[in-house]
Amino acid sequence: MKYVIGIDGGGSKTHMKISTLDYKVLLEVFKGPSNINSSTKEEVKRVLQELIMEGLGKLGQSLEECSAICIGTAGADRTEDKSIIEDMIRSLGYMGKIIVVNDAEIALAGGIEKREGIIVISGTGSICYGRNKEGRSARSGGWGHIIGDEGSGYDIGIKAIKAALKSFDKRGEKTILEGDILDFLKLKSHEDLINYIYRSGVTKKEIASLTRVVNSAYIKGDLVSKRILKEAARELFLSVKAVVEVLSMQNKKVVLTTAGGVINNINYLYDEFRKFLNLNYPKVKIISMKNDSAFGAVIIARSECD
C-alpha cells in the first residue's frame, strides 16, 4: 500500500500522521521535541527516526512503500538545516521524496487544507506566510523575540512591562498594569522585576503569558492596554500586507487563516486585526483552521507525489 508521512516538528513535541494517497489518516504518533534550533542534532535524529519506525511498525508497513515524507519545522527555510534533516531521514535507508519546509507552511496547508492562501501565526512568537496559485511564496516576520516577532505574545508582554514601569516612574500614562503585573507574577515591588527579568532565567513563554494580564486590564477599561493590543493587531496586519503585496494578491480572492493563542484567544486584538484587513483587502476571506499542521505536512507530501 502506498502512503505518505507528514511530520510537525515542534519545540515541545513532534506530531506525525501517516496517510493514504487519498488523505485517509491511518495513524498518528507523538514524540518529544525535534526542533533543530532548540534540540541537539543527535536528539532530533533520534526522535524523527523513532517516530517513523514506531509508526510503520504499528501499521506493519515498509519504508519502501512510502511515496513522500514532508517535515515542517521552525527555521527550515535555511538550506543547511534542510540538508541536515533530510540526511537524518536518508540514514534510515529511505530513497523516496523528502520535503523539508518551514512550520508556517505546514500550518497554512493544514489550516486551509490546500497550499494556496495566507496564515498569520501569533503565539509566543509571530509570523505571516503566504503562497499563491502560481506556487510563489512569501513570509513576513518570524525574526525572533529580540529583533522581531511584532504582534506576538512576547511583544505584548514586553510592552506591558515597559508601560507599567513608565507608569510607576510617573513618566508615562497611568495604567493598572502597574499593579496587575506584580500581582500576576507574585512580586512585591517593581524593583523585584529586575530580578525577574534579568536574573531568574525567565523564558519567552513566561513573558508572553502577560498577554492575559493585558487583556484583563483592557476589559477593565485600561486605555494603555487597549493601545498595546491594537498596536499588536496593526503589526500583524502589516505582516499580511507585506505578503499580499509581494505575491500580488491585492485584488484577488484569498483565503486567510489564523493560528496561535494570542490572535485566536484575545477577542479585541482579533477584531481589530479583522477591521484592518477588511478595510484594506475586502476580498480576503478569514476562516478558522480546518486541520492541524501534521495534516498540512501530509497535504504537501501528497502534492509532491504527482
Curated annotation (Swiss-Prot):
Substrate binds at residues 35, 142-144, 149. It comes from the Bacteria. It catalyses: N-acetyl-D-glucosamine + ATP = N-acetyl-D-glucosamine 6-phosphate + ADP + H(+); N-acetyl-D-muramate + ATP = N-acetyl-D-muramate 6-phosphate + ADP + H(+). Optimum pH is 7.5 to 9.0. Retains half maximal activity at about pH 6.5 and 10.5 and is inactive at pH 5 and below. Pathway: Cell wall biogenesis; peptidoglycan recycling. Its cofactor is Mg(2+). One of its GO terms (biological process) is carbohydrate phosphorylation. It is found in: Cytoplasm. Belongs to the eukaryotic-type N-acetylglucosamine kinase family. This is N-acetylmuramic acid/N-acetylglucosamine kinase.
